Amino acid sequence: MGIIELKNIVKTFPSEKVGEGVHAVKNVSLSIEEGDIFGIIGYSGAGKSTLVRCINLLESPTSGEVLVEGKNITAYSEAQLRAVRRRMGMIFQHFNLLNSANVFENVAAPLKNQRRFTKDEIEEKRAELRKDSSLSEKEIKEKEKALLKSNKKLSGKEIKERVEEMLRLTGLEDKARAYPSQLSGGQKQRVAIARALVGKPKILLCDEATSALDPNTTTQIIELLRSLQEKLKLTVVMITHQMEVVKSICNKVAVMEDGKVIEEGSLVEVFSEPKSSTTKEFREKTLYRKEALALTEKNRRNLYELTFIGEKANDPAIMELVRTYPVEVSILFGNIEILSGVPFGTLTIDMKGEGKDILDAVAYLKSREIKVEELGGHRIEGFSGEENDSCRGQNPEYYKNTERSEEVKIDDELREEDKIWNG
């Protein structure tokens, strides 16, 4: 069982214009394992942000179950949910910092009135004591009493130590007394990350955390999140519409469209063998498919995309191909990267020669366990070269009903963060 289990989650928002309401999430089931960096990707209006808010019950599902560490939290009281939310950090697209507070005070904010242990942690520690066969019943009771007595609010010293640790981990040691107005966008997001993790959560939820950042800063934040995930043993859920973000950090991914999960699996599986048109669109945005198709339309070339996974990324197949078969091969585009620790390479080639020789060459490549896909050329019947609508699959009614100004979105996020910290 995963650390997070979503079972048949449905979320419907009431709407005066739509009689049955707006179905933002439709019967979604997902299992997220401990230690995963799980990406949920989709276009605007796909339902991904609503889904992630169902994980910590900032949005209560209309139906379905949310299990965290095996416990169905949809049945929890508000008091129980407060304890659960403290074990789930969350960062948003907007940084939501307190402008009148410095960096240290912003990071320390969630620790106000926090005790050393949650009720669940107390129960876990009591269970560990009772499993210790070396302790007598009297000793167990004495230790339980001492445990409960020690569960006081965090002292000023403890808060200071925690905040300083998070500032060090996020590279903000020299910014403790700075105010938000003195920080760059990337530094503000680092403060938000430190604040989300200062309570020592096991789970970090990221809702479009890099969308407001430039590419260089996005890369830095992704590297920071990866480092923190390893050091703090976090389970991370990444909500994004950016395939580059998913490729850079996630080991698993789910693709959402119109409130449904249409595809999921390991990053390598989903990226190398996309099944849905939406997933293919996301994939093509990170390759040179558009440029290759333009060349095909202009010059009627025989273009092929070759995919190399794992050890095959080092395979000298092209060199051996031209030595063995009477064909000419031109490499138009090429790329190799590491996806979740696995080498993943693509080549777009133009192949010239007699029809039979080209077919034999393609068969040879496939025999080397290289995926070969025709992109276009005079041998492909019915090829139109038309590009798909980049927004296909969105739920326009949902997007229209949930479209808000940036100011209102920020207000919503502030309320949600207050709910996480204070219930």
Where are these regions (language model features)?
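Helix-to-loop junction immediately C-terminal to a conserved catalytic motif
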Residues: 56
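ABC ATPase NBD coupling module
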Residues: 19, 73-89, 113, 154-161, ...
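Conserved ABC transporter NBD signature motif
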Residues: 64-72, 120, 124
